[in-house]
Structure formats: structure tokens, C-alpha cells
């Protein structure tokens, strides 16, 4: 073992973590990096897993979306937070940019259906309606 390996391992154990729901690169991950770049992000699949990560000591902090300026409050968080044992200590704002993508050569008038996550569709509904594009939840 190289002497630096022990130092790296010790520093790794000392690094505090911030749990978030989603994958690396998700908006919640971006919010973690913007608000607390000193913390190591810990990706979790669900909001329940984020809360469990903090309660079990796997992470010291959680980054949870409470509200979306387009979609409104995040109902799951308002249901989970009161019984979680966690409380809000800070907030950050992350701008969300939604892109409509298609295969090369397809132009906007050719698009008739947009598939996306169920939460995202209402956020893009005005644009979709203006362009006669049917919204369809991705499975």
C-alpha cells in the first residue's frame, strides 16, 4: 500500500456527505454542488432513501426539493418531511431548463408526441399546447 493511500482513505472517511434523489448530473445534484460544494454528493433512488441516508448516518445532510416554481409544491416532500426527524436549515434555488429533443433531421412541426417524466410534462405543457404536441408520460 502506498503511504498516500492511507491518507486518501482517511480523508474519504472524513468527508461529509449530502444525499439527494436522482442520478449524478440531475438538478438536485446540481443544487448540491451549488449550495454545498464542500460536501460529497450521495445519489439515492427515492426521497425515502435520502431521508434514511441522513437518519442512518450515511450522510450528514439531505438536499430535497420542496417547491418547483412551475409545478408547485413537491407533495412527497410535504408528506415525508414532518415525520422524517429532519428540518430545513438552508435553501438554494436551481434554474431548471427543459429541452425538447428529436432525431437529427426532425423539425418542430414534425413532432406530434413528447414523452417525458410525469413531473416534467406539466412544466412544459404551455409550450406543448402551443405547438400541438401531445404529452405522454414515459414509462
Report the location of each language-model feature.
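Domain-level signature for soluble enzymes in the chorismate/prephenate branch of the shikimate pathway
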Residues: 1-139
